Every structure is written in structure tokens, then in C-alpha cells.
Amino acid sequence: MSESEAPEPDQPAGAEEATGAKLFERWDVTGIEYDDPSTERYITVTPVEHTMGRHAGKQFQKSEISIVERLINRLMQTDENTGKKQQATRIVRNAFDLIAERTEESPVQVLVSAVENAAPREETVRLKYGGISVPQAVDVAPQRRVDQALKFIAEGTHSASFKSPTDAHEALAEQLTGAANYDVQTYAVNQKEEKERVAAAAR
């Protein structure tokens, strides 16, 4: 290799090739817009959908994982789908194709907007005063907000597709587009509103 072909010392190996990488070899992950500054730090978007558990066991490092992979992992957290990573990945890939076909928008942007809209700002905790449990409203940490949003989206997908003629990728596409549009009929947004309603009553 000549000196002209050698990479710069500060440049990561393969940086030029990585710049043009796309999620599922289709979707560009650059130029994503965030409407909620509190969760922007915890919604990571990368073209890598499977990191082989690189951050497993490291506290709070889940925020370094792509939000797409975190959604895939969430979809596996039912008895029927435990460990079926390829199946969950295929569901997300097909859902993204369906979202792009229906909305003509970037499905990655739709996912980010859905997570932001489904993330609850308040919830309740139980405090004991003299042996009596009293609900108390508390603010939700940004990282937990993202966790809860992914949980609601996965639960809504499972409930809409389990023992139903609706395919899982169709149910997921409906959940994401509904949440991105802040449709209160969507399971994820409905659960967020319910949590905040209960918290408001416990102030």
C-alpha cells in the first residue's frame, strides 16, 4: 500500500464504507429529526440492527444500542417469541416496508416519532405512611420513558396479532404509524395517556 492509499491516523478503519451504510440495506438513518429534547440522548439510530449483545450486562448501556434493535428485542419478550431474533427482525423489516409504502416517509423517522409520542412523562409510585400505601405522582426519567414506549408498542403489536388474522408486521406498522400521529386509539398512546391520567389524580 502506498502512502497516498494509507488511511489517516485519526480516521477509523472502514469509515468511508460505514458512512454509506443503511439499515436493512434500504433505509438511511441520517437526518433524523427529534421533537423531544429530553429523550433525544436515549434514542440512538444506527444502521446496525444486531450487535450480538455487545452491551449486555452493562448498566444503562442499552441507550447505546440502536432503537431498532431495542424494538426487535422487545418483540421477543413473550412466551411464543423468546429467542426468535431472526423472526422478530423479519417482522420489523416487513413493517418498515409497509410503513414506507403507506406513508411515503422514512420508517426510521416514524419509529422515532412513535417512541417520543408513546413515552409517558409521569407515573405513580407507592409510598408507605404509617403502614398505609399512598400513590404518589413522580416524573419519569428519560431512559425509562423510552423503555416504557418500546414496551407499549411491543405489547400493542402482540395483542393485535396474537390469535388474530392480522399479521405481526401489519400490527406493528399500525402501532408505529398510529403512535407517530398521536392517535389515542393506538394501544401505545392509550397506555401513555392512562399512566399520565392516574399520575395526575395522585398529585
UniProtKB/Swiss-Prot annotation:
Residues 1-22 are annotated as: Disordered. GO terms for biological process: translation. One of the primary rRNA binding proteins, it binds directly to 16S rRNA where it nucleates assembly of the head domain of the 30S subunit. Is located at the subunit interface close to the decoding center. Belongs to the universal ribosomal protein uS7 family. Keywords: Ribonucleoprotein, Ribosomal protein, RNA-binding, rRNA-binding. One of its GO terms (cellular component) is small ribosomal subunit. NCBIfam families: PRK04027.1, uS7_euk_arch. Part of the 30S ribosomal subunit. It comes from the Archaea. GO terms for molecular function: rRNA binding; structural constituent of ribosome. This is Small ribosomal subunit protein uS7. CDD domains: uS7_Eukaryote.
